[in-house]
């Protein structure tokens, strides 16, 4: 699937949710088990996901992906995800 700024944001969320755990497990042993190590691991996973999504880099897009990676099983995230129904990536990132 080709992803553009007009792509439904829930499709991108699904892509991130499906691939982040696998990337996390693959890279886990390459980073120390400290706050700094986990932060560096998160950044690496976000970079890999941004390459997979293949959109031009922006701080907003990276922050959006990082939020999905860091908080996938929280009530707040579930409510946020529900609020994105029907929106495009462009709507979310540039609002």
Name these PLM-found stretches:
Residues 2-4, 36:
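Short Lys/Arg-rich cationic patches that frequently serve as NLS/NoLS or arginine-rich RNA/DNA-binding motifs
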Residues 5, 9-12, 49, 85-88:
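Generic short amphipathic/hydrophobic targeting helices enriched at N-termini
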């Amino acid at each position: 699937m080709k992803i553009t700024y007009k792509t439904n944001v829930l499709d991108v969320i699904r892509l991130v949710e499906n691939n982040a755990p696998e990337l996390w497990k693959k890279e886990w042993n390459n980073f120390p088990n400290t706050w700094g190590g986990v932060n560096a691991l998160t950044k690496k996973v976000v970079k890999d996901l941004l390459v997979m999504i293949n959109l031009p880099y922006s701080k907003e897009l990276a922050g959006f992906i990082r939020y999905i990676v860091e908080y996938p099983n929280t009530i707040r995230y579930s409510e946020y995800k529900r609020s994105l129904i029907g929106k495009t990536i462009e709507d979310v990132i540039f609002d």
